[in-house]
From Swiss-Prot:
It is an enzyme of class 2 (transferase). Homodimer. Disulfide bonds: none annotated. It holds the Pfam family TSNR_N. This is 23S rRNA (adenosine(1067)-2'-O)-methyltransferase. Its EC number is 2.1.1.230. NCBIfam families: NshR_TsnR. CDD domains: SpoU-like_NHR. One of its GO terms (molecular function) is RNA binding. It comes from the Bacteria. The lineage of its organism: Bacteria, Bacillati, Actinomycetota, Actinomycetes, Kitasatosporales. GO terms for biological process: response to antibiotic. Changing F88A: Defective in RNA binding.
């Protein structure tokens, strides 16, 4: 295995770079910290540009990650575990992490150039749910996600990277206002289908529609906003036992996209 250099001096510029990138109050985010083997590998595979990848000297550096970094010419160094403990004081301490340049924000044009359905999240704020939705949307052939009123200001949000296991860089995730999202959907000629408890049609009927759709999911508490409701072509419900009030939004999305799987996989071929 390749012998890796170890950073043992807290004054090393790389240490200061990590300190800077983990500050919560940064306003202009150009670099981000990505943690753990799986998110690192998924981010690298998605084309994210890394400045350097690090590992704690208290654990063996994963060979598969080292090989991938080598193929992509990404520098790799170890950091003394005492410095790692200081860097992530009070936080969960990752064994592997890297500093990457934040990709440019996704635009509606990035979604328009693809052919799968579009996922719209209206007022969904729990980052764990959004991360799960990113992974499911990618797996089931959606062309992108539009986040409205999510309280997320950048896809470089470390919580979102963790929750999505790094897949947030693998498909377009557009941060948008409601009016802009509705205009894009209309201009693209898509029907807006709103998922809600008392929908007009069953989710099973989604699979029969050959057209590209925009699937709207509101927050679990408030549901979709009035503006999106007015713009919807139809509302869709998921049949369930009467004693169950609602499903988690990421579960609802998985059910809806699975009904669309044949259409979306064909569109992505």
């Amino acid at each position: 295995m390749t012998e890796l250099d170890t950073i043992a001096n807290p004054s090393d510029p790389a240490v200061q770079r990590i300190i800077d990138v983990t500050k919560p109050s940064r306003s202009n985010i150009k670099t981000t910290l990505i943690e753990d083997v799986e998110p690192l590998m998924h981010s690298i595979a998605a084309g994210v540009e890394f400045i350097e990848v690090y590992g704690s000297d208290s654990s063996p550096f994963p060979s598969e990650l080292l090989d991938l970094c080598g193929r992509q010419n990404i520098p790799v160094r170890l950091i003394d575990s005492s410095i790692v403990n200081q860097l992530f004081k009070g936080e969960r301490k990752a064994k592997t992490f890297g500093i990457a340049r934040v990709p440019r924000p996704a635009r509606f044009g990035d979604i328009a150039s693809r052919r799968g359905d579009v996922v719209v999240l209206d007022g969904v704020k729990i980052v764990g749910n959004i991360g799960a939705i990113v992974r499911t949307s990618l797996a089931l052939g959606a062309s992108g996600i539009i986040l409205v009123d999510s309280d997320i200001t950048s896809i470089a949000d470390r919580r979102l990277q963790r929750a999505s296991r790094g897949y947030v860089f693998s498909l377009p995730v557009v941060l948008s206002g409601r009016e802009e999202a509705i205009a894009f959907i209309r201009d693209s000629g898509m029907q807006l289908m709103t998922l809600k408890a008392d929908g007009d049609i069953s989710v099973k009927e989604l699979g029969d529609n050959p057209d590209r759709l925009a699937l709207l999911f509101g927050s679990e508490k408030g549901g979709p906003s009035d503006l999106f409701e007015e713009a919807s072509s139809a509302s869709v419900s998921i049949p369930m036992m009467s004693q169950t009030e609602s499903l988690n939004v990421s579960v609802s999305l998985g059910i809806a996209l699975h009904e669309r799987i044949d259409r979306n996989l064909a569109a992505n071929r």
